[in-house]
Amino acid sequence: MAALRPGSRALRRLLCRSFSGGGGVRLARERPTDHRDAASSRVSRFCPPRQSCHDWIGPPDKCSNLRPVHFHIPENESPLEQRLRELRQETQEWNQQFWAKQNLSFNKEKEEFIYSRLQAKGAGLRTESGQRATLDAEEMADFYKDFLSKNFQKHMRYNRDWYKRNFAITFFMGKVVLERMWSKLRQKKTSS
């Protein structure tokens, strides 16, 4: 690939820094929260250290199973960078809400399906050994097929909106990269 040639390292570094928000992304362990961060985080109670200068990826959310990202806000953030960060945050919150609702609905309907099938068989919710009764894979396949069929339109709307949001984010990322490159070129011209 042409982008991986040794001569293009500077461009790769610049692009990587631009797309990651200035320096990188850190994976994080779950930490106790402060009151200051609990109010600002609607997605997770996880909070990165105050002095952090990177985006942090938190532990998976219990409802949505998605890992929330806590975006670093640089001191000299331009209006375009701020708009990009806000768009990414809005998209993350939208995504978290959709999957939390979807997973709740899925689990509720799955339990109802299992209960109704066990009742139809005349079996109880527990086996003779006291373990929770389950259905085999073929029986569960009926549920999965029905669930996907019932939610087909919802998933199509989600995918369409997801692609629109990602296109907008990618567009803003490109604008931010260009803005940063122009500002670096202007700095070089004024310093020479």
Curated annotation (Swiss-Prot):
Would you name any one GO CC term? mitochondrion
How is this protein positioned relative to the membrane? Answer: Peripheral membrane protein
Explain the consequences of disrupting this gene: Mutant mice generated by CRISPR-Cas9-mediated gene editing are born at the expected Mendelian rate. They show impaired motor skills, with decreased motor coordination and endurance. Mutant show global COX deficiency with reduced enzymatic activity, low steady-state levels of structural subunits and defective assembly in all the tested tissues.
* Residues that span the membrane, as ranges: none
Q: What are the entry keywords?
A: Apoptosis, Membrane, Mitochondrion, Mitochondrion inner membrane, Transit peptide, Ubl conjugation
Q: What tissues contain this protein?
A: Expressed in atherosclerotic smooth muscle cells (at protein level). Expressed in aorta, brain, heart, kidney, liver, lung and spleen. Isoform 1 is strongly expressed in Kidney. Isoform 2 is strongly expressed in brain.
PTM entry text? N-terminal mitochondrial targeting sequence is cleaved from the mature protein once in the mitochondrion.
Q: What induces it?
A: In conditions of increased oxidative stress, the protein is stabilized, increasing its mature intramitochondrial form and thereby protecting COX from oxidatively induced degradation.
Gene Ontology process terms (BP): intrinsic apoptotic signaling pathway; mitochondrial cytochrome c oxidase assembly; positive regulation of cytochrome-c oxidase activity; protein stabilization; response to reactive oxygen species
Q: Does the keyword Membrane apply?
A: yes
InterPro entries according to UniProt: COA8 (IPR018796)
Note whether Membrane occurs among the keywords: yes
The entry's function note states: Required for cytochrome c complex (COX) IV assembly and function Protects COX assembly from oxidation-induced degradation, COX being the terminal component of the mitochondrial respiratory chain.
The UniProt similarity line reads:
Belongs to the COA8 family.
Q: What is this protein called?
A: Cytochrome c oxidase assembly factor 8
Q: Which organism is it from?
A: Mus musculus
The upper taxonomy is: Eukaryota, Metazoa, Chordata, Craniata, Vertebrata
Q: Which gene encodes it?
A: Coa8
